[in-house]
């Protein structure tokens, strides 16, 4: 799926089509996505969460990865919006131990780290008029 040579899968692919956790994650990401347009230093954001910048080659403006469990990596993939298309923040997973994780746990980790990234946005943009969600974490 990407140029990094790893199979990247969604929570829906891990849990199945009826995954309630994919809907939970999608809703949480949609509410927070606009704030990530304020990220000026992607490397700094990656360090803030203990992750690293990755180039997945899927048309993203930036993506970060974070190992959340031995053999389980989460990828936060951001695409800036423009006049024609809205922006998006998506999450994908990879790793040899992905199938031993519960969807509920993966969703929890995703939301936890996205909220932590919002703190970074708030701390690095002290004078900006940020989306309200940045002030709720």
PLM ranges: what are they?
Residues 124-137:
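Short, highly charged C-terminal tails/helix-capping segments
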Residues 77-105:
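Intrinsically disordered, low-complexity regulatory segments enriched in Ser/Thr/Pro
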Residues 52-80:
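Amphipathic, interaction-prone secondary-structure segments
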Residues 30-33, 64, 98-101, 105:
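Conserved aromatic-histidine-acidic binding/catalytic patches
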């Amino acid at each position: 799926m990407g140029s990094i040579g790893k199979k990247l899968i969604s929570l829906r692919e891990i849990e199945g089509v009826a995954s309630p956790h994919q809907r939970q994650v999608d809703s949480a990401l949609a509410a927070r996505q606009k704030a990530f347009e304020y990220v000026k230093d992607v490397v700094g954001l990656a360090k803030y969460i203990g992750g690293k910048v990755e180039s997945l080659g899927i048309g993203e403006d930036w993506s970060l990865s974070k190992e959340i469990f031995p053999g389980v990596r989460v990828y936060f993939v951001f695409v800036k919006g423009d006049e024609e298309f809205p922006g998006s923040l998506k999450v994908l997973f990879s790793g040899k131990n992905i199938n031993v994780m519960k969807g509920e746990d993966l969703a929890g980790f995703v939301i936890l780290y996205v909220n932590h990234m919002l703190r970074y946005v708030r701390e690095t943009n002290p004078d900006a008029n940020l989306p309200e969600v940045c002030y709720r974490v």
